[in-house]
């Protein structure tokens, strides 16, 4: 799930992902396999594979699992063939939602995703219905009480597009092509982020609260529980207090 960038939501997302570590491994293995199939198994020459392997390492995936996934992608080991793509639609409260998927059975995935939208009052749309509301960017988040001035200086010098501060949380935005350079430069300066990824960032946020916020989070959780779903992006804005109440 990727929505509002406030620290409360980042922490919710991280906690939810940690609780679903088995599913996270499944999704990461798919991403590594597809990246290796498309661009080959050489990490130096395949940026998508490099990013996928980095995420797997951050999730503490065993090295053997990573190497096996690469070999399945390159054909050195037998593996499943996956189709990838996106679904777009609206969730409760008119929140725009993008779902990235990888599947070996598109018919099943379409039915499952549509069911998740419908169950909680959302609606699946056509391709292009909400994608224009998002930009693909590198996003590097530093936790509360981070050294904004140092991050700002290092990040912009390394090629970042923007650096924001909100309640002590620092967010660095980059073009996708510059993400690795900026992240690595920050790391070399001893600046370790809470999260770092190429993601879809909303251009505008949609505020939701009460029952709509609850239904939205349930819908997103149901989508993320689907093994065929890789990522869910949404332009929701839920207050810290409301998010804490929903997550109980």
From Swiss-Prot:
Subcellular location: Cytoplasm
One GO term describing the cellular component: cytosol
Keywords, in A-Z order: Cytoplasm, DNA-binding, Transcription, Transcription regulation
Keyword Cytoplasm set for record: yes
Keyword flag DNA-binding: yes
Pfam families with a match to the protein in the record: TACO1_YebC_N (PF20772), Transcrip_reg (PF01709)
MF-aspect GO terms: DNA binding
Single GO BP term: regulation of DNA-templated transcription
Family statement: Belongs to the TACO1 family.
UniProt xrefs under NCBIfam families: PRK00110.1 (NF001030), PRK12378.1 (NF009044), YebC/PmpR family DNA-binding transcriptional regulator (TIGR01033)
Protein name: Probable transcriptional regulatory protein Pcar_2335
